[in-house]
């Protein structure tokens, strides 16, 4: 956790010294697939959480039209199932390798792919009576890892080198559940708008 926070601080410092730093606000939808295997029989359930994300990144030129955009962000998602409210808050560090194409003098298209390192801060459930469960609690029979690694890609458009419209999809590579016989993976869809300084 400390290493990821340190990396995020370094990226923020590096971005602050750049003329291409982008601040973004967006929507995310996280789809979580949980599988449980017992006696050779596997059952599965998929749930989704929706929320907001804010981030900052810097698109650094590598060569020609090839760039890399390291960044740091945070997201907050919620869902309700009956009288139970679920919420998740986390930090993430994307490293998006991208290639740009000029569509016109004012419009440019970038396609990107890369990893995202995700660190969960809060993941809990609370009912109407105030009973609360922290899914990162190691004493739970079914508890979760705070760390996740996602791979994905997408595209963004920049207008007059100031406005950015971005869409992406990332697939979780790790089983985030620590309990025996469980496999839980997350996929994330995101749409955002950003301003380039």
Range-by-range predicted roles:
Residues 20-24, 67-71, 108-112, 164-166, ...:
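Residue-level detector of the transmembrane beta-barrel scaffold of outer-membrane proteins
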Residues 30-41, 69-81, 126, 138-197:
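Predominantly the C-terminal beta-signal and adjacent terminal strand-loop region
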